[in-house]
Amino acid sequence: ARPEDSGLFDGNSPAFTMRFNSARTEWRLVQERCDNCQFAPPHMSCVRRGKQQVAFIRHARTAVGDGISNTMEACIPGLYTDGSAVVWCPVLGRGDLAAAAMLYHSGGERCHETQHLITRQPVWNEEVESLVLDFKGRHVTSSAKNFQLALEQKPTHIICQYGKLANSSFGLDFKFPM
């Protein structure tokens, strides 16, 4: 290793960790050093209370035409009017991001401190007999792993896309507010 690279990566101290449920259909992404608690002593921080949540993600499979589409929805902390991100820290009284997502989807009131992302569904194309997604200028190879996410309130405005570029190469594109 080059001397200038030392300290850039420490496998024992990741910036983020992701955990999943036993069915591997739900994931939580947490930030190891909370923006709210980073200077607090450990006993007063959120380190033992779930840490700062960055995203709650749920995966499912949905029939579309003659195919099956992998779908995803995500709940992420929202933005304040000044553009700064909400810090989803348990010390600040914020519960689990999953609870905010579940409340909203069970017909409850939407939490204005979160943003909900949904999968843009592919459409069945009779000509190629396959599900297709338009990656708008990005050359993408067909794959069941390809997806696009949009804000729920703007379903045609893609803010994240993941696509197969070559045999073992994938690209992840994202923009504000991610």
Protein language model regions, located:
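Cationic, beta-structured binding surfaces that engage anionic biopolymers and membranes
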Residues: 1-178
